[in-house]
Amino acid sequence: AGGIAEMSHMGHEIREITDALDAAGNTTAAIGKGFAISSAAFVALALYGAYVSRVAIPTVNILDSRVMPGLLFGATLPYWFSAMTVKSVGIAAMDMVNEIRRQFQDSDVAEGRKEPDYESCVIIATRAALQQMIAPASLVMLSPLIVGILFGKYTVAGMLPGSIVSGVQLALSASNSGGAWDNA
């Protein structure tokens, strides 16, 4: 809201009001992110307990040679997923940039005499969002299956807590840095 007020050259008093609203919104978002991350962590732990119970593993010893590789691999999964997601956003953004460049080659659009084709931009964004998330989603869904088939239930019992702990730390870090960037 503050950016819109500034770009539209509204008075200083309007900007003060929008700054207060922005601060309230940022605080609410930060609290909401904390609750979301915490609840996701607890749900993941509950699902892990259900997995261990279902496959009848009496105890999970992290020093076991079948568990430790899974723990290390699981710890890398959230970072791998995040890297794939960020790369996907870059690819989708370039698709959009290329479409906008194509439209601005029409001098009528560039000079404001003709409306741009907004629908093609929406289609590109939707298609890119769906296509580019196939690989990251496959990583998340197929990793436990592949690890379980190749290495067994004990390695999966290591992989899952590795990804839970690493994922929570990554989520907290991303939430805090995102909040800092938002307020910069």
Q: What residues fall within each predicted segment?
A:
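Hydrophobic packing and interface segments
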Residues: 1-184
